[in-house]
């Protein structure tokens, strides 16, 4: 039986602890806490979960954590707020440069994007 939690299909043959990390906003540590609270062994494969266990995990996640679309939209709103108030981090977001003090003279290609080459100036002959 395919297990679907918050719009994400969990892989059937993975351990519960690993499979829950396929949900945006849940990492290894949080998945362990969720399974402990639900009373499910971390090493149990998803295909071996019962309907009651799936419902318990679903309920714990929806009650206690902000994940998937809600988390993505909250992050986007936080970035938009930074840009609107015009703080340093907001300005760096706006112009697409690193936010946390990294040097941009040589590297920062991930944030800056592909190189934009500038043609050399032609020398004037005397």
UniProtKB/Swiss-Prot annotation:
**BP GO annotations:** translation
One GO MF term: structural constituent of ribosome
A GO cellular component term found in this entry reads:
cytosol
Tell me the PROSITE patterns matching this sequence: RIBOSOMAL_S13_1, RIBOSOMAL_S13_2
Q: Which keywords, in A-to-Z order, does the entry hold? A: Ribonucleoprotein, Ribosomal protein, RNA-binding, rRNA-binding, tRNA-binding
UniProt cross-references to InterPro entries, sorted A to Z: Rbsml_uS13_C, Ribosomal_uS13, Ribosomal_uS13-like_H2TH, Ribosomal_uS13_bac-type, Ribosomal_uS13_CS
Residue span of region Disordered: 99-126
Report the Pfam families cross-referenced here: Ribosomal_S13 (PF00416)
> Where does the record place Basic residues bias?
108-126
Family membership noted in the UniProt record:
Belongs to the universal ribosomal protein uS13 family.
Which HAMAP family does the protein's record reference?
Ribosomal_uS13 (MF_01315)
Matching entries from PANTHER family are given as:
30S RIBOSOMAL PROTEIN S13/40S RIBOSOMAL PROTEIN S18, SMALL RIBOSOMAL SUBUNIT PROTEIN US13M
Q: How does this protein assemble?
A: Part of the 30S ribosomal subunit. Forms a loose heterodimer with protein S19. Forms two bridges to the 50S subunit in the 70S ribosome.
Q: Which purpose does this protein serve, as stated in its record?
A: Located at the top of the head of the 30S subunit, it contacts several helices of the 16S rRNA. In the 70S ribosome it contacts the 23S rRNA (bridge B1a) and protein L5 of the 50S subunit (bridge B1b), connecting the 2 subunits; these bridges are implicated in subunit movement. Contacts the tRNAs in the A and P-sites.
Q: Know the name of this protein?
A: Small ribosomal subunit protein uS13
UniProt organism field: Azobacteroides pseudotrichonymphae genomovar. CFP2
């Amino acid at each position: 039986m395919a297990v679907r939690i918050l719009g994400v299909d969990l892989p059937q043959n993975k351990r519960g602890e690993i499979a829950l990390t396929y949900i945006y906003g849940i990492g290894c540590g949080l998945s362990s806490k969720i399974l402990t609270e639900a009373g499910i062994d971390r090493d149990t494969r998803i295909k071996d979960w019962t309907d009651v266990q799936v419902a318990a995990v679903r309920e714990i996640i929806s009650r206690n954590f902000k994940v998937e679309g809600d988390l993505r939209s909250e992050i986007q709103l936080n970035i938009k707020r930074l840009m609107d108030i015009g703080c340093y981090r907001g300005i760096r977001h706006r112009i697409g440069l690193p936010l946390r003090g990294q040097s941009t003279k040589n590297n920062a290609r991930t944030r800056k994007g592909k190189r934009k080459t500038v043609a050399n100036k032609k020398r004037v002959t005397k």
